[in-house]
């Protein structure tokens, strides 16, 4: 995250101290908000981190869930039960050599479907959060193009605006 801070600071996209950046990260990723946004009855029960790294189920559909470590842990704990992860396949879209891959995948989780998902595999959650944060700050609501291990990639981020503040709504490769 220090490199993300340095990048954003060097390019004038974040002007505070490292402590300010930590507080900003905590707020955009971990502060809870109402994902429905417009509901008459506000239910605070989601965060950017939960959506992107852990996943959510609503109306029998999986949303978010773009982290391979969480996917692996849930798949491992399923032990073939009908609840948990039912992995239906993947396609490697980009390969970063020994540093991981970018895949698209299809699966069910506790009976809910993820018809099309994408995630990095073999990368650290810290790297993923750093890349997503950079894209959120620099290219919010736009496609963020960059290279990872000399391989061109695209990351998409969406904001969730509540209480006059932009939180991470989602982020994915």
Regions found by a protein language model. Name each.
Residues 1-147:
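N-terminal "domain-start" segment
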Residues 141-173:
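A cross-kingdom marker for long, charged
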């Amino acid at each position: 995250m220090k490199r993300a801070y340095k990048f954003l600071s060097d390019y004038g996209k974040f002007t505070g101290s490292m402590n300010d950046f930590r507080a900003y990260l905590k707020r955009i990723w971990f502060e809870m908000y109402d994902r429905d946004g417009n509901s008459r009855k506000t239910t605070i029960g989601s965060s950017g981190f939960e959506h992107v790294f852990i996943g959510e189920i609503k109306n029998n559909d999986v949303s978010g869930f773009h982290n391979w470590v969480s996917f692996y842990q849930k798949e491992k704990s399923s032990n073939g039960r009908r609840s948990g992860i039912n992995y239906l396949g993947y396609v490697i879209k980009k390969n970063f050599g020994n540093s991981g891959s970018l895949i698209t995948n299809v699966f069910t989780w506790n009976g809910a479907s993820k018809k099309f998902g994408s995630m990095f595999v073999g990368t650290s959650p810290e790297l993923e959060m750093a890349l997503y944060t950079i894209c959120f700050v620099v290219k919010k609501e736009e496609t963020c193009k960059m290279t990872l291990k000399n391989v061109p990639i695209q990351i998409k981020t969406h904001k969730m605006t509540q209480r006059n503040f932009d939180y991470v709504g989602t982020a994915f490769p």
